[in-house]
Regions:
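Short acidic-aromatic low-complexity motifs
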Residues: 1-23, 53
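A solvent-exposed, acidic/Ser-Thr-rich amphipathic alpha-helical stretch
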Residues: 21-69
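Hydrophobic/aromatic beta-strand elements that line small-molecule binding cavities or substrate pockets
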Residues: 44, 48, 62-67, 80-82, ...
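A generic structural micro-feature
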Residues: 55-59, 70-74, 91-95
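Hydrophobic residues on conserved beta-strands that form the core of alpha/beta folds
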Residues: 60-62, 77, 112
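Short beta-strand edge/turn micro-motifs at domain boundaries
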Residues: 75, 96-123
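Short, cysteine-centered beta-strand-loop-beta hairpins and adjacent loop/turn segments enriched
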Residues: 82-93, 121
Length: 123
């Protein structure tokens, strides 16, 4: 599987409300989301479990995915519309976001080693 296919599979899993931690390397450093910072593989896994537990009805629309692979490393950037419902606060969220990050090949799979998601105007 290519790095690009892994990213698209991650988007599909996010839409479907499936577990996401397996997409990250065991030694993943950090995942930045809108308003959050998850550090280390345990922190990333816990944050993603909580996200899956407390959200539903995801829309993930990729508008400009660009991926570069070189050897066992890959990096990417994308403009993504993300929308979801928070089932605890009963709020709907809808954002145009920018994604970037790095992946490392492990055997036949790619795993994220870092990811950054931001919305224009984030502070």
């Amino acid at each position: 599987m290519s790095a690009e296919a892994t990213i698209e599979e991650y988007y599909d899993a996010l839409r479907a409300g499936e577990p996401l931690a397996a997409f990250f390397a065991a030694d993943a450093l950090v995942k930045f989301g809108i308003g959050e910072r998850l550090e280390g593989s345990d922190g990333i896994a816990a944050g993603l479990r909580e996200q899956t537990r407390t959200t539903e009805d995801w829309i993930v629309e990729s508008h400009d995915l660009r991926v570069m692979e070189e050897g066992e490393w890959a990096w990417f950037a994308d403009d993504v519309r993300m929308a979801w419902d928070d089932i605890e606060s009963d709020e709907h969220h809808d954002h145009r976001t920018r994604w970037s990050g790095g992946l490392r090949r492990t055997d036949d799979d790619w795993r994220f080693v870092g990811m950054h998601v931001s919305a224009p105007g984030d502070s």
